[in-house]
Design a protein with these regions (language model features):
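Short hydrophobic/Thr-rich beta-strand motif most characteristic of the beta2 strand and flanking loop
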Residues: 29-36, 44
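C-terminal output helix
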Residues: 110-119
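Active-site beta3 strand of CheY-like receiver
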Residues: 48-54, 59
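The feature encodes the CheY-like receiver
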Residues: 14, 18, 60, 69, ...
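Charged docking surfaces used in two-component/phosphorelay signaling
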Residues: 19-27
Length: 133
């Protein structure tokens, strides 16, 4: 899957995590935008077009659950795949994310190969769903 055509939004309040993730994804050919909190993420989502969101849960201003809930409630944004990337490894948190509409859930630190395959799988599912419409 050619990644150059895809634009990803990385939402994480930790600068080191944002930088590491965005550099890794850019090396794979993705266009990457970073947001430092939930409110900024929603502002970007309402201004620009993204193919996938990598969303942390523990964010200032507006947490990842709130962002996910608003994103999935907005018909113009609800079809964007969301992969949760968080240090939280609780069954309740994972279940809540899936109930709110997350497409996948990765616990930090995660393997770069796993991340790459999960992103590809989400993008392929979205592409197939759009082709079927």
């Amino acid at each position: 899957m050619a990644s150059q055509q895809y634009s990803l939004l990385v939402v994480d309040d930790n600068e080191m995590n944002r930088d590491l993730l965005s550099r890794r994804l850019e090396r794979q050919g993705y266009r990457v935008t970073v947001a430092v909190d939930g409110r900024q993420a929603l502002e970007f989502l309402n201004r620009e077009e993204f193919n996938l969101v990598l969303l942390d849960i523990m964010l200032p201003v507006m947490n990842g659950y709130q962002v996910l809930e608003q994103l999935k409630a907005d018909q113009s944004l609800s079809n964007i795949p969301v992969i949760i990337t968080t240090a939280l490894d609780e069954a309740d948190g994972k279940a809540r994310c899936m109930e709110l509409g997350a497409d996948d859930y990765l616990t930090k630190p995660f393997n770069p190969v796993t991340l790459k395959s999960r992103i590809s799988a989400c993008l392929e599912r979205r592409q197939r769903a759009q082709a079927g419409q």
